[in-house]
C-alpha cells in the first residue's frame, strides 16, 4: 500500500475512507483548546531529523507538569500524550500503534522529553485504547521508517502479501493481492498445461 501511495501516486475511495475522512473533519482543524491545566492541540505538526519523518498528530493532550517540557502555544510546562483517531471499533492494529509511536518519538526529539504512552481513539465505538510505547514498539517503528525511506529512494513497489486487511483496503482492485504468481510462473504453468502435465478438472 505504501509503495502504491508514495511511488505510484495511486488512490481509490471506499466506504471506509469516506467515513473516516468525515469522522476526522472535526479533529482535522488546527486549533488549541485550553481547559484549566489541560491543553488539547489538534493537527499538531511534528518532525524528526533522526527518523526523517514529518507529519501531523490528530490530537496532543498537553497536561500541566512542573517537571515537563515547554511547547509553543502553552505558557506552562507540560507532559505530552498523543491521541490518534481511527475509524471503526476498538481493535488491535500494529500499524496504528507504530504511527502513534512515531508521533511520540518525533515530539520527544523536538521538545527533549519522554513520552511513555499514548492512545488510539476509535470513533465508531467511542473508546480509547492505551498504547504503552515500549522499546519493542520503538525498535519496530525505527525499522519501518528505514524501510519506508528505502522504498521511496528506490521507487519500488513490493509484491503484495494477502491478509484479512486486504478485504477492506480501498486499493485492493489496483493492488490485486490474490494474484501471487509472477509472469514467469504463469508462463510455466501454461507450458505445463499444454504438455498435459497439469490436468484441469472437467467437473
List the model feature ranges, each with a label:
Residues 94-96, 132-133:
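Short, solvent-exposed loop/turn segments at secondary-structure boundaries
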Residues 108-203:
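Metal-dependent nuclease catalytic regions and adjoining charged, substrate-binding loops involved
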Residues 96-108:
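Short, charged, amphipathic alpha-helix that recurs within catalytic cores of restriction-modification
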Residues 59, 103, 169:
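A residue-level signal for conserved active-site and pocket-lining positions in enzyme catalytic cores
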Residues 1-82, 195, 203:
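Metal-dependent nuclease catalytic cores that hydrolyze phosphodiester bonds in DNA/RNA
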Residues 81-85, 120-121:
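Glycine- and acidic-rich phosphate- and metal-coordinating loops
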Residues 85-93:
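Short beta-strand-loop-alpha-helix junction that forms the active-site gateway
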Amino acid at each position: 500500500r505504501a509503495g502504491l501511495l508514495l511511488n505510484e501516486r495511486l488512490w481509490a475511495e471506499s466506504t471506509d475512507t469516506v467515513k473516516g475522512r468525515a469522522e476526522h473533519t472535526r479533529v482535522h482543524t488546527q486549533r488549541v483548546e485550553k481547559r484549566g491545566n489541560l491543553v488539547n492541540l489538534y493537527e499538531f505538526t511534528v518532525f524528526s531529523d533522526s527518523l526523517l519523518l514529518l507529519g501531523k498528530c490528530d490530537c496532543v493532550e498537553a497536561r500541566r507538569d512542573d517537571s515537563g517540557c515547554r511547547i509553543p502555544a502553552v505558557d506552562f510546562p507540560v507532559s505530552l500524550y498523543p491521541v490518534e483517531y481511527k475509524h471503526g471499533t476498538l481493535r488491535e492494529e500494529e500499524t496504528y500503534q507504530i504511527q502513534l509511536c512515531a508521533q511520540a518519538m518525533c515530539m520527544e526529539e523536538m521538545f527533549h522529553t519522554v513520552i511513555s504512552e499514548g492512545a488510539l481513539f476509535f470513533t465508531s465505538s467511542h473508546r480509547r485504547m492505551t498504547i504503552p510505547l515500549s522499546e519493542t514498539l520503538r525498535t519496530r517503528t525505527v525499522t519501518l521508517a528505514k524501510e519506508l525511506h528505502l522504498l521511496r529512494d528506490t521507487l519500488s513497489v513490493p509484491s503484495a502479501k494477502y491478509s484479512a486487511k486486504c478485504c477492506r483496503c480501498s486499493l485492493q482492485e489496483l493492488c490485486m493481492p490474490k494474484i501471487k504468481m509472477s509472469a514467469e510462473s504463469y508462463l510455466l504453468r501454461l507450458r505445463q498445461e499444454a504438455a498435459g502435465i497439469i490436468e484441469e478438472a472437467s467437473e
